[in-house]
Design a protein with these regions (language model features):
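Juxtamembrane membrane-water interface segments immediately C-terminal to a transmembrane helix
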Residues: 41-78, 84, 91-98, 347, ...
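A short, aliphatic-rich beta-strand micro-motif
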Residues: 207-211
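Membrane-interface helix-start motif
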Residues: 17, 233-238, 341-363
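N-terminal sensory and localization modules of signal-transduction and trafficking proteins
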Residues: 1-17, 151, 262, 271
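Short, hydrophobic beta-strand elements of compact beta-sandwich sensory domains
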Residues: 222-229, 321-348
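Extreme N-terminal signal-anchor transmembrane helix of membrane signaling/transducer proteins, especially
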Residues: 13-48, 52, 56, 357-367
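Extracytoplasmic/periplasmic sensory segments of membrane signal-transduction proteins
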Residues: 74-189, 237-240
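Intrinsic low-complexity, intrinsically disordered coil/linker regions enriched in small/polar
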Residues: 134-135, 160-165, 172-177, 187-191, ...
Length: 367
């Protein structure tokens, strides 16, 4: 079959692409590539910024908590040493319980502590501090020699520290079984007690800085104990803002909670008695998942010897963690943990990324 010249010419023209299309398509593809690359780089840089910000924030919060622990717990050690030295030098007479209690009362007014105790080998006890009311200082005594029993008598005080009315009696007070006394006499040196709970509601957790006291012949006289209630540490953690939903908590190397920034107490009441709480059993999901991650990652909490910056995923979301050991010369060995969810920062990053992409698309439309 033969084609007429003009028919072939028309077919040839139909195969050619329009010049406008040839010019526009590469340009559009370049803009799409630029938009995609810009969005990717924006998101990537945003995530890098989140990493840096989360690390810096958790580091700053950890530093503040460590500094608070240094100052707060150093006070108890310092005071235990001062009182022990005063007894050694004969400046504080252990036989005059009322005078000793008044001296302790004055120290309570000066220092941020919970309770001051002195127990002797002959079961005499003298103390001053916060008892049932966290805002009122009481003085307390137990003296089998004078009273004929081991009952603990607690008195309210006036504004000068003089005892006023008797308001509580704790029957058969055996302080020698409590950690602050028993562990110190066994160690024979200045130590922190293990964390223990007072037997009165609301069952506050406490840790005590203790110093044994000896006579000139190196015979044990008794033990000076300075209680620090862990509620004061808890209150500090709640005041320190981590992030929108970030948390901070402190635990022992055995996994038991010391305090946290959540509203949860570090113990549960079971059949009327307090039972301390493992961080892995916390009702706060972020604290629980972080503690479980640390336990799984290290095998045991006591294997964490240095500060660590870590991250894990919970429900598909990254969680940034900083864990820092805190120790002192009297034997405390705690872990300070700060956890920051990625979502606390990504909302603004994602908004910025969306804005960048929209601007690029706007430029595409105008082009």
């Amino acid at each position: 079959m033969e084609f007429l010249p003009n028919q072939a010419n028309q077919r040839s023209k139909s195969k050619k692409l329009p010049l406008r299309l040839i010019l526009v398509v590469p340009f559009v593809l370049q803009i799409f590539a630029a938009v995609g690359l810009t969005g990717y780089l924006s998101l990537r840089n945003g995530q890098r910024a989140v990493n840096e910000l989360a690390t810096r924030l958790s580091g700053e919060v950890s530093s503040r908590i460590n500094q608070h622990l240094d100052n707060y717990l150093k006070t108890a050690r310092h005071l235990a040493q001062i009182n022990g030295d005063a007894i050694d030098l004969g400046l504080l007479e252990t036989q005059d319980q009322q005078k000793m209690a008044h001296y302790f009362w004055k120290q309570m007014r000066l220092y941020d502590i919970g309770y001051i105790s002195f127990g002797t080998l002959t079961n005499e006890f003298t103390g001053a501090g916060y008892y049932l009311d966290p805002n009122k200082i009481v003085v307390s005594y137990a003296s089998p020699k004078k009273q004929g029993n081991r009952d603990f008598y607690a008195y309210e005080t006036d504004s000068y520290g003089n005892r006023t009315k008797l308001f509580d009696i704790f029957k058969n007070y055996q302080f020698e079984k409590e950690p602050w006394y028993a562990q110190t006499t066994k160690a024979g040196k200045s130590i922190w007690s293990s964390v223990y709970q007072w037997e009165i509601t609301p069952f506050p957790l406490a840790v005590s800085a203790n110093r044994p006291v000896y006579d000139k012949n190196n015979n044990l006289i008794g033990v000076i104990g300075i209680d620090q209630r862990l509620t004061q540490i808890r209150d500090f953690l709640r005041q320190v803002k981590v992030s929108l939903s970030g948390k901070s908590f402190i635990l022992e190397s055995n996994g038991l909670l010391i305090a946290s920034s959540s509203q949860e107490e570090p113990f549960k009441i079971i059949e009327g008695k307090p039972k301390r709480l493992l961080a892995t059993d916390s009702s706060d999901k972020l604290i629980q998942s972080t503690a479980k991650y640390l336990q799984h990652n290290f095998g045991n909490f006591n294997k964490i010897k240095d500060a660590q910056n870590l991250e894990f995923r919970e429900n598909g979301e990254r969680q940034f963690v900083q864990v820092t050991p805190w120790r002192d010369e009297w034997g405390l060995d705690w872990l300070v943990v700060v956890v920051v969810p990625e979502s606390d920062f990504m909302a603004q990053i994602n908004a910025n990324t969306r804005t960048t992409i929209m601007l690029c698309f706007g430029a595409l439309v105008l082009a």
